[in-house]
Regions:
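AMP-forming adenylation/ATP pyrophosphatase catalytic core
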Residues: 119-126, 130-352
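ATP-dependent adenylation/nucleotidyltransferase module used to activate substrates
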Residues: 1-152, 163, 172-173, 179
Length: 352
């Protein structure tokens, strides 16, 4: 019987995944990750999901392990998060965490305990292309919950030993399954925030981590005129309008940031639209590499509606995307994910 270690967050999704895996005949063990030990978080802001995960595992008769990967999380995800903001970028820590921690360090731990597969409660699918043998990452059946964007950095090796039991289900069916099996978290609210910034105040979090306030600097318009002083370099992201505290009409928006002098450049809404981007650090999934222009659909952030584009290979492993229609606030540091139908072609980090 194949041994599956299931990442259990304490939420309804991973708990329902345990029920499905048991029904499919796997020997299932629960594995809960503690990631936030030692971080400068107020005690009342620390999530306590481990108790729910343990209770569900007990109800279902699963062996259960609670593993503290806080040092690894701090050294990879948190350091990346801070470094990217200080460089003037807007990071996506969940994408980074999935590859390095949840499907990296957690798998390493599970393998030492005898795991054949790692499973999670993500809404996505994995299938193997019969023609190429490559493992494909595909969108989940519930398009409103699809998490393929956040899983875009997974490698072929990681995909080959991963199971997503919820891929064919929609959220109401998942809750109904949990209710039918008497799971205590069947109606538990979905988490919406970055786990280490539960109140959404990433500026205060970074300030506590680094021990000082973010540098101030000038607001500058497109003509190079200084419009005033901002309150801290990391407080602003491309496309932002609220919080500028500038009484100027028509309204101004953040266009870009320069870490050299901590300047924040402002312009009008129409200045935010672009017809192309360049991205690097690519992770290819459905293909080994991009060698010729390819028509794809694109997401430059999770909440974005997909846009049609042509992907063109450049030198040095970079790719240019030319959009059919201009896109707003394409932000350096974010991940751009390419789709061919429901399958993820690959992803890169937006450079410009």
């Amino acid at each position: 019987m194949a041994q599956v270690f299931l990442g259990m967050s304490g939420g309804v999704d991973s708990s329902a995944a345990a029920v499905l895996l048991q029904a499919q005949g796997y020997a299932v063990s629960g594995l809960h990750l503690s990631l936030l030990s030692g971080l400068p978080l107020p005690a009342d802001r620390l999530p306590d999901d481990g108790s729910d995960a343990r209770a569900v595992a007990s109800l279902l008769g699963l062996p259960f392990y609670d593993m503290d990967l806080s040092p690894e999380f701090r050294a990879t995800v948190i350091d990346y998060f801070i470094r990217e903001y200080e460089a003037g970028h807007t990071p996506n820590p969940c994408v980074f965490c999935n590859r390095r921690i949840k499907f990296g360090a957690m798998w390493d731990a599970a393998r030492k305990l005898g795991a054949d597969y790692l499973a999670t409660g993500h809404y996505a699918k994995i299938r193997q292309d019969p023609a190429t043998g490559r493992h494909l990452l595909c969108r989940g059946a519930d398009r409103s919950k699809d998490q393929s964007y956040f899983l875009c950095r997974l490698t072929q090796e990681q995909l080959s030993r991963t199971l997503f039991p919820l891929g064919d289900l929609e959220k109401p069916a998942v809750r109904a399954l949990a209710e039918a099996h008497g799971l205590i978290n069947a109606q538990k609210r979905d988490s919406q925030d970055i786990c280490f910034v539960p109140d959404g105040d990433y500026v205060s979090f970074i300030t506590r981590c680094v021990g000082h306030e973010s540098p101030t600097g000038p607001f500058v318009d497109r003509e190079g005129r200084v419009l005033g002083q901002h309150k801290g370099f990391i407080r602003y992201t491309k496309g932002q309008h609220k919080g500028l505290d500038l009484a100027i009409e028509p309204p101004l928006y953040v266009l870009r940031k320069d870490p050299a002098d901590h300047a924040v450049y402002l312009g009008h809404n129409e200045d935010l639209f672009t017809s192309e981007l360049i991205a690097g650090d690519w992770n290819w999934i459905s293909i080994p590499a991009l060698t010729a222009p390819m028509t794809v659909t694109v997401k430059t952030r999770y909440s974005q509606r997909e846009a049609e584009a042509v992907a063109e290979p450049l030198s040095g492993g970079q790719v240019r995307l030319r959009f059919r229609e201009p896109q707003r606030a394409v932000t350096p540091g974010q991940f751009v994910v390419l789709y061919d139908g429901d399958a993820v072609v690959g992803d890169g980090v937006i450079l410009e």
